């Protein structure tokens, strides 16, 4: 990696590590699930979950459903579903957002591998990585927020990403941000 910062003193080589396109992976998993008989119920609010001998009864705002298996894929609202099933062992998701730079595919060759820094208490830290589509992705920050729907990007957050990414990788072509 010719663009590793001069200040970098150590590295961990993880040859089995890899990158995926999270959107493409999600669609592929959903397509595979559909081909295997999974029925999706979009725009439906779960109001209750009851364990049955052979599966689950799911109460929704569109009527009840029964399923052998329920996957809690509620994202930042997964705590609500968890707490319906395990009210004596509740969990709370603290929402967090992150700022990123996405650079044009012409910048994708700036690094050949995902460059992580030492993780902190808020996560994996800022990384610099090529994407499966040839772009360069830099980030994220990790900001606790109140609003589970909060997706704002801030100048301060982008400044933090720029500074932290520069500790690991030099000469990042940020002018190619898209």
State where each predicted segment sits.
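Flavin (FAD/FMN) cofactor-binding and adjacent substrate-gating region
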Residues: 1-42, 47-59, 169-173
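Active-site substrate-recognition segment that forms the wall
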Residues: 48-50, 64, 69, 74-178
